[in-house]
Amino acid sequence: MTEYIHRNIDSELIAWKEDSMRKPLLLRGARQVGKSSAVKNFGKQFEYFAEVNFERNKAIKTFFQGDIDVRLIAKKISSYINVPIEAGKTLLFLDEIQECPEAIMALRFFKEDYPELHVIAAGSLLEFTLQELPTFGVGRIHSLFMYPMTFDEFLYANHEEGLILLRNEAYGNQSLDQAFHDKLVEYFRTYLLVGGMPESVLAWTKTHDFNRCRNIQEDIILTYEDDFSKYKKRVNPDLLRTTMRGICHQAGEKLTYKQISADYQSSQIREALRLLTLAGIVTPVVATSGNGIPLDAEADEKSMKVLFLDPGLLLAVLQLEGDLSQQLIELILAGTPQELVNKGGVIEMVAGLEMMRYKPCIQRQKMFYWEQKGKSVAEIDYLEIHNMKITPIEIKSGTQGGMKSLWLFMREKKLTEAFRCSLENFGSFDYIDKQDDDAIRHVTILPLYALSLLRSR
């Protein structure tokens, strides 16, 4: 039996189980991020676990045809798989539900007609199917979004719970002991290559073989592209493949459609990007004015960067494209922390992924950055809402003199707090702005291995 690795979603599932007002749960996310494993592990909380996989159990699709009687459907499933389905004792798991649109439509009726039964559904490229449904139970279904493993989950997989606890006690000017800091930096470098796909992480913990992880990552990418062909009646699979791979060449950069492909129009690439976003494979980072909350009130979707699902998968795509340079690998493994942060677009991308995944998973999160165009472009890597205030976050190592965009933004928006994220140890400093009546700007230095602390500080 495959070893289960602790996931952040575990606590969300337990809370859902205990909620007397719970709705059927739809677990959403890209293929192979660990949805099925998380539900199967959660199923141990119940006396019975009734699993239906619509890719394997095609006959069960017929149970959902015609008039929907969910109690009768549950009885039929119970008889077919020979597992008791009893309210309060059984978890009913409908996996790969995108293969049975009728089952998606039926989820709402479990809330209306059989609310005491615990029901979870999961699927991949689910949003491609949902687009064709008139409704699938808005208000009667609870969604949770799942992603590849965060850096903290990666540490858990490597049995470094104690290291996490030590790290969590440091903040601001209370730095971490250098030995622990160095160890976390090395783990972070490893995470960039191994990524957060559970199969790759498990392979790393067993073998410490980067090549084995890369083979797994390449297989996952090819599986994604095979999935695209299932929807060729709705969208051109080659367009999705070209867009997905093209995005990876622009990690940490402002997205340019022409660099993705000269064979497709911008409108086609834009539609492919929308579908990849819905599928959880990419996340746009949209430019915003940063004038107030909410950040998307003045967002400009014509200017965006894109976060790819996982750093390991990103490098696998570059490998498949013949564009993964030895210099990049050497930079990740052996470059100085300052070089790695300031020269590697993948670092900026991973920082964005980390910040996004530590937010509530009940909705698809939006990410924002700021830019000011002129003779020279000023840019802030990320804008976040922290303690109900707009907070600029720079992914950068170096001196105060290299942070002109940050001082410009804080001066313009009258802000006093910011974060600088790098592979430096914890720390903070004050900057006296001579161009703004000696206003004091306070900058907290937060290591990239500690971005989960943004939730609680």
Summary of predicted features, one role per range:
Residues 426-457:
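Domain-level recognition of nuclease-like catalytic cores that cleave nucleotide substrates
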